[in-house]
């Protein structure tokens, strides 16, 4: 039987308004177009490949459908995935998929040849209902505001806001060599980037093109080895020369370039009204599309120095690597303009969600904790992620009240602050 404290906490979680400060929902059509959009979401897709499915079985490009048109009819993609779906029954992604099918659609959690076509019809019919996305986001999730980083589509509907992601300071990545990254910068810029002055003008022109006046935040995916070492203008000139010549760069050179570029970007942003920066760290995507967590000891000191240099900005941070759990908590504890948010990519699993919540409650003032960000591409995937996050929050808070570590009133205040008040204040929501 549920105790009074646990019931009060559960009631607060059931009733709280939720602000989702990072998603990839399409403004014109936030919901899934078909069942394949749901079943082959990239978190599921990569596990199916890892379990034995061919890289090109359900997408001709061998890439997630969020990045490339799969070029294969949805029903055929699903049929090809069926032999591999049983292999992920144990994973959190597999559980999330079952929750979507069962809770939102009333379908069996396990798809097979006998029920596949009916499941496809049900999803198609729901998607044709004008109120479907509103039902999922508002009624089932309680999400009253979202910020999408997707650029395509018409103006955002009510309660959906826009943001942009940009990383003009990452001169190398898991999929691209420095000369390839530099070429992509030059394509955006419209001319060669050969000197630090060229690079500074590239950043300035990029800020102008973004139209940041209409954005709720600028999202920055930082290299974990960002460092003030080798971040002088002359160091940037050396990096640009070596990248142009297709010469290898050291980690220190890449980290210094990143540090210089981020500082330069923030200086340019000071010419605009935008002061909210969303920082994500701890993931690198290797070819063909295999994301891994990554960590470097330089990051914590570098971001603390940047936050100190740019105290007029708000930095809301999330990580895909559990190694940053304590680091981000201590940053938010000690640095006034740094706060923490959600559980991104490789940390969106119950064990790591619990660890993050416990760490943040232990050390971060409650007005600097953001409980949730979906990172979802379709509204249906917001549902299981939020369901899990709320479940773990409920367990953690109930245990703390039972131990006498906090009272029920504090627990309820934490829920309201972390799920709505804090993200609404940080990101300017109503």
Predicted regions: what they are:
Residues 3-271, 313, 329-430:
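Metal-cofactor-binding active-site regions of metalloenzymes
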Residues 227, 235-240, 260-263, 274-328, ...:
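Catalytic core of soluble alpha/beta enzymes
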